[in-house]
Regions:
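Bacterial Sec-dependent N-terminal signal peptides
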Residues: 1-24
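Low-complexity, acidic/polar, glycine-enriched regions of mature
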Residues: 21-181
Length: 181
């Protein structure tokens, strides 16, 4: 009887913790890529070492990436990107911290969501509000988003000699696969 009483007293405390724990997700080796439609040539790169955490209970989401992990087809572009444009020695990371709205863990199929929060890049932080989708796939969550950022918003300067080669706006694609924690 004492065991049953203890169990019943602990149950209200244990169940919310278990539910909350099941609603936290972690993504590693996820992908952020970008594409710049230049007049002379297109520029694109992919970072497949991005880590992210998502709490499906309250919608909190955050990701962190290392700028040096962006891979280019042309290695010289990668060197210029890190040294001349992104100043990776001074600003080695980019991050996002915010909230995803419009997501229901119990729904099936792709759900249209919004991510609203603070994107930090090149030492500058701006509020962003971007569309995306979340889909529950085999107890994992697939989050995808595509949005445009202006380089000038993040104080990324393009030298006058190559400004025609590089678009002032860059398309960013996010592709995360979360697993339960």
């Amino acid at each position: 009887m004492k065991s049953l009483t203890k169990l019943l007293l602990l149950l209200p405390v244990a169940i919310p913790w278990q539910v909350t724990a099941q609603q936290r997700y972690f993504a590693e080796k996820s992908v952020v890529s970008f594409f710049s439609d230049g007049v002379v040539e297109d520029i694109s790169a992919t970072n497949s070492k991005v880590t992210s955490i998502f709490d499906a209970h309250d919608g909190e989401v955050a990701y962190l990436l290392s700028i040096k992990d962006f891979q280019f087809v042309n290695k010289l572009m990668q060197v210029h990107f890190n040294e001349k444009y992104m100043d990776t020695e001074k600003f080695p990371k980019s991050s996002f911290q915010g909230q995803i709205t419009g997501f229901n863990l119990n729904s099936t199929g792709k759900q249209q969501v919004k991510a609203k929060g603070k994107l930090t890049m090149h030492g500058v932080t701006h509020d962003i509000d971007v569309p995306g989708t979340v889909e529950v796939v085999d107890n994992r969550l697939a989050l995808k988003s595509k949005f445009i950022i202006k380089l000038s918003d993040y104080d990324i300067k393009i030298p006058q000699i190559v400004w025609q080669n590089i678009a002032q706006q860059v398309e960013v694609t996010v592709d995360f696969m979360y697993r339960p924690l």
